[in-house]
Amino acid sequence: MLCSILSLRAQTFVKPAVKVKDTSFAVITDKGTFQACEAELKAYQEILGMEGLPTFIVYNEWNKPEDVKKVIVKLYKKDKLEGVVFVGDIPIPMLRKAQHMTSAFKMDEKNNDWRDSSVPSDRFYDDFDLQFDFLKQDSVENNFFYYNLAIKSPQQIRCDIYSARVKAVDNGEEPHAQISRYFKKVVAEHQINNN
C-alpha cells in the first residue's frame, strides 16, 4: 500500500494512495488509537480506496472540538470531503440551548446537571453553518465540551457531510482491542462484497 504522511500543526494526515477526483472520506482518530490500530485503520483506508473512495486518516492528541472541525472543513474545501468517521477518543460537543433540534430529548437545563441536560452531538462537526458559543470543558469527563447554540446560528440542521462514531464500549475489554477487531471485521466484509 502506498500512502504519504503529512504532519501539520500537530495533526498527522495519512493521505490516500488513490487520487481524489470527485469525493473523499476521512477517518479522524486520536494518536493512541492510531498507534494501537494502525494496521487495521490503514487496511480500511486501502479497501475504501480500492472501492473508489479516497480516504484520509487524520490523527492527533485533540485538545478541543474546534481543532477537529478545522481539519474537517479544510478537507471539505480542498479534497471534496463527503463524510467522516470518528474513531476512539475524539472530543464530544455537548450542546445546550439546542433541544428544539432533537426529536425527543427535552429537559430543564437550569435545574438539571449539565451532563444530563446537554445533547451530545456531532452536528458541531458536520453542519458547517451552525454556530456555537463555548461555555466550558467538563471537569470530570475531560472529553466533553459544552457549547450553547448561538443566537445568531441557523435553528435547523443541514449537514454538509455525514459522520459516524466508532467507540469502544465499557465492558472490561481493552478499548483498542475492540476497535482493532471491529475494523478487521469491516475490512473482511468489504473484501467478501468486492469478490
Enumerate the language-model features and the residues they cover.
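Bacterial Sec-dependent N-terminal signal peptides
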Residues: M1-Q11
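Cysteine-dependent hydrolase recognition
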Residues: Q11-N195
